């Protein structure tokens, strides 16, 4: 926690500034973890690394988190909820009736949110195979986002803007799973992958074509 120059100047001589609060320490641990994940996987990061980076002792670390895996779970939970809240805001305040822009805005929520936290995204995806908590967190929100997508597809069909082709929920599932794999491959620079600068346009094209195209 920092204090402004003005508040520091008003402190009596010889007094120490306030110690970091519990919230500050927790945030410091989370920030340290995200920074370290930029350079190496969670398996190569120790609790001592996290404690040292946060400016606390190892015993103090365990006051806030039971393990480094719990730190990752918290980081991923924050990113996932950030994306979910942004999508909820869009759903409650629709700003564009153009169908391509409507879907672009929604997909961009995930592109921007997860793209701003690539290290956490990579670590979270890797942890799904070994962490029940991470897998459940991701599954819960994917199901929520798929249900929302299906509801929008149904609404577009009900107003006559989109044809009734594949079942909406199945189409929404395939599109969201495609987003997940394609975005994360681009963020990680995998080969093959769509270049990050073009991945949003690519996904929007596929979504619009799939939702509004007729069966052949």
UniProtKB/Swiss-Prot annotation:
Keywords for this protein: DNA-binding, Repressor, Transcription, Transcription regulation
Site entry: Inhibitor-binding: 176, 179
Chain intervals with Polar residues compositional bias: 1-10
Example of a GO cellular component annotation carried by this entry: cytosol
Knockout mutant characteristics: Cells lacking this gene leads to ETH hypersentivity.
Segments of this protein annotated with the region Disordered: 1-24
Gene3D superfamilies reported for this sequence: Homeodomain-like, Tetracycline Repressor, domain 2
Pfam family membership, one: TetR_N
Gene Ontology BP, a term: response to antibiotic
HTH tetR-type domain segment(s): 23-83
SUPFAM superfamilies with a match to the protein in the record: Homeodomain-like (SSF46689), Tetracyclin repressor-like, C-terminal domain (SSF48498)
Record comment: activity regulation: Inhibited by tert-butyl 4-(3-thiophen-2-yl-1,2,4-oxadiazol-5-yl) piperidine-1-carboxylate (RF1) and 1-(thiophen-2-ylacetyl)-4-(3-thiophen-2-yl-1,2,4-oxadiazol-5-yl)piperidine (RF3).
One Gene Ontology term of the molecular function aspect: transcription cis-regulatory region binding
DNA-binding region: 46-65
Any further remark recorded for this protein: Binding of inhibitors to EthR induces a conformational change in this repressor, which is then unable to bind its DNA operator, consequently allowing for increased transcription of EthA and bioactivation of ethionamide (ETH).
Subunit structure: Homodimer.
Function: Involved in the repression of the monooxygenase EthA which is responsible of the formation of the active metabolite of ethionamide (ETH).
Protein name: HTH-type transcriptional regulator EthR
Annotated organism of origin: Mycobacterium tuberculosis (strain ATCC 25618 / H37Rv)
Gene that this sequence comes from: ethR
């Amino acid at each position: 926690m920092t204090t402004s120059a003005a508040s520091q100047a008003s402190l009596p001589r010889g007094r120490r500034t306030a110690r970091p609060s519990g919230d500050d320490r927790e945030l410091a641990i989370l920030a340290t973890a995200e920074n370290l994940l930029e350079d190496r996987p969670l398996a190569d990061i120790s609790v001592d690394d996290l404690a040292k980076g946060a400016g606390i002792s190892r015993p103090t670390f365990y006051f806030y988190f039971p393990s480094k895996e719990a730190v990752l779970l918290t980081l991923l939970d924050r990113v996932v909820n950030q994306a979910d809240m942004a999508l909820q805001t869009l759903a409650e305040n629709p700003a564009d009736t153009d169908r391509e822009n409507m879907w672009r805005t929604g997909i961009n929520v995930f592109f921007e949110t997860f793209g701003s936290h690539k290290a956490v995204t990579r670590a979270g995806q890797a942890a799904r195979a070994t962490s029940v908590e991470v897998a459940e967190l991701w599954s819960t929100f994917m199901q929520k986002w798929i249900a929302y997508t299906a509801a929008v597809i149904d609404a577009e069909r009900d107003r006559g803007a989109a044809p009734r082709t594949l079942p909406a929920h199945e189409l929404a599932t395939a599109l969201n799973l495609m987003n997940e794999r394609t975005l994360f491959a681009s963020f990680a620079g995998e080969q093959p992958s769509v270049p990050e600068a073009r991945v949003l346009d690519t996904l929007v094209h596929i979504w619009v074509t799939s939702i509004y195209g007729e069966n052949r």
